[in-house]
């Protein structure tokens, strides 16, 4: 079930499958029927279903990959005793512990929870200015922005986003459109 509009594009999903060498079936659920039927509220969500169609495990959020693999192997062995499985995947789980990094930050009007600017964050065309001080784990905008339920789009140049983040290894952005993006750390 796609979280972002670009994830609904079959060509993008196919490119990701190719890039990461995924050789198992991948379903593209643009109508969110799986999401709706399972009353899901989280990305990512993992549902393990046994050979009889019974949901045997549900996991919300990242991490716990070794447990998920162990459970998958158990379900495969229960469905087919004596099955020969390849060796278990051995990868370090680098999921940060809760509270050690800045939570996911969304600029969409319906999902924003950590806006640290002085203005109201609302849909439509709005003018923003960076506050003199930005609290940890919050973001602020500067310039003219068009805010909607998919995200925030600069309405005029220059426009900027400031994020006071805590990270262990990386910061990820989901962006679209045309133009130049500059990233400055501690600057």
Sequence positions of predicted segments:
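Non-globular targeting/processing and membrane-anchoring segments
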Residues: 66-187
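Structural microenvironment flanking redox-active thiols in thiol-disulfide oxidoreductases
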Residues: 1-19, 30-34
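Sparse, context-dependent recognition of short Cys/His-centered cofactor- or disulfide-binding micro-motifs
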Residues: 11-12, 20, 32, 53, ...
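Short linear sequence elements within intrinsically disordered, low-complexity coil regions
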Residues: 9-11, 25, 43, 111
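Detector for Asparagine
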Residues: 12, 30, 37-40, 80, ...
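Thiol/disulfide oxidoreductase modules built on the thioredoxin-like
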Residues: 18-23, 28-73, 86
């Amino acid at each position: 079930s796609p979280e972002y509009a670009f994830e609904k594009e079959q060509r993008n999903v196919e490119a990701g499958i190719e890039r990461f060498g995924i050789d198992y079936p991948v379903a593209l659920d643009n109508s969110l029927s799986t999401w709706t039927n399972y009353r899901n509220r989280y990305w990512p969500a993992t549902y393990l279903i046994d050979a009889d169609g019974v949901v045997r495990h549900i996991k919300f959020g990242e991490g716990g990959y070794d447990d998920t693999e162990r459970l998958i192997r158990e379900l495969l062995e229960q469905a087919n005793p004596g099955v020969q499985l390849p060796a278990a995947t051995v990868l370090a789980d680098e999921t940060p512990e809760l509270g050690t990094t800045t939570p996911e930050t969304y600029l969409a009007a319906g999902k924003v929870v950590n806006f640290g600017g002085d203005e109201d964050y609302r849909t439509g065309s709005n003018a923003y200015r960076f506050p003199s001080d930005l609290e940890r784990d919050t973001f602020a905008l500067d310039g003219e922005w068009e805010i909607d339920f998919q995200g925030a789009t600069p309405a005029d140049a220059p426009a900027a986003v400031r994020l006071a983040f805590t990270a262990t290894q990386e910061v990820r952005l989901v962006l679209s459109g045309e133009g130049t993006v500059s990233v400055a750390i501690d600057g």
